[in-house]
Amino acid sequence: MSDTYFLYHSIGLYPEKTADLTTAMAQFAQSWGRPDDGQWGYALDKRAQFVARWRAILNAGEGTVTTAENVTSAFHSLLAALPAQALAGRRVLVGADCFPSNHFLLAGMAQKYGFTLHTVPLRQGAAFVEDEDFLAAWTPEVGLALLTWVSSTSSHRIDLDAMVAHGRSMGSLIGCDITQAAGLIPYDVTAPAVDFAISTSLKWMCGTPGAGVLYVAPALIAAAQPEPRGWFSQDNPFSWDINAFAYAPDIRRFDNGTPGTIAALASLPALDWHARQDHAALLAHNRRLTARLIAAADEMHLPLITPRAEAKRGGSVMLRLPETLPAAQIVTQLRGLGISTDARGQTLRLSPGIMTTLAGTETLITALQNLQMRA
């Protein structure tokens, strides 16, 4: 049931999503199957519209945002494009509560690119890395720091202004993974100014898989030489003199061969929907429902691992279930009642969004109370 949908940290729903997605894919099929030469014009225009929507979300300038398959591929594209001195012999800083896929990537690249991966650990028994611990580890030896704006396992939100200010004083490149709050909490790549940002179109944006994005600040674009390059990396893709390659002056240098367009095209209706919304109202709705979930957790004596202060959390509420309530079983039982949630270990993840209602939230709470009493 849509009113008991709590998976905005995962996929995301909005009214008429099924109909919009069906229409978008049918229109693509009609264009791509037509016996004329209009296919690429149609597909690339949709991709450009997708990028424009993301630029508005990020307050990013023209020529600074491009598509990627996912967050990990966007991050790899950026890392592999940096000048050698940016990473070689230096440290790359990341928190232990980052998206694990990004950590897997960094661990695999460290030896090849000559940097030392420094992972800021969790304190004993903690669910997220404390800002002060991350700042203490951020010394002038750090060539690049990847900030996780909101953690996927706790919904802890960092003090981005303080982090970026400190990073600037250390002379580091600063990137931000905004995946877990993009589209819900306002984000501006220029305030505070970061060197790059990565995200997906899933979750609060309600898009489809494969529709990742990469933002790179103009100054860093100028210094970057992306490793995978191809005809779309050029200012003029139809410059086919094989001895005269030159990177495009803007984010297009991060494109390479013929670009994939279907994920962007399929996600565009969701981004169009999002652009029409009152964004303050979307956040206020989430805050009302998350406040109720936090109060209910206290009533049920379920440990809250998400920070209580609104300024220190994203849009999710995450609870640590006791061993008497195996999380996987709880998720399955809730699913049987038409309530959509998920878990990581014994952490139950709850993210109410536009389709979730207060009545649906009360339904979830009652179900959890009943399951708790039966345990």
Segments the model singles out, each with a brief description of its role:
Residues 1-375:
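Pyridoxal 5′-phosphate
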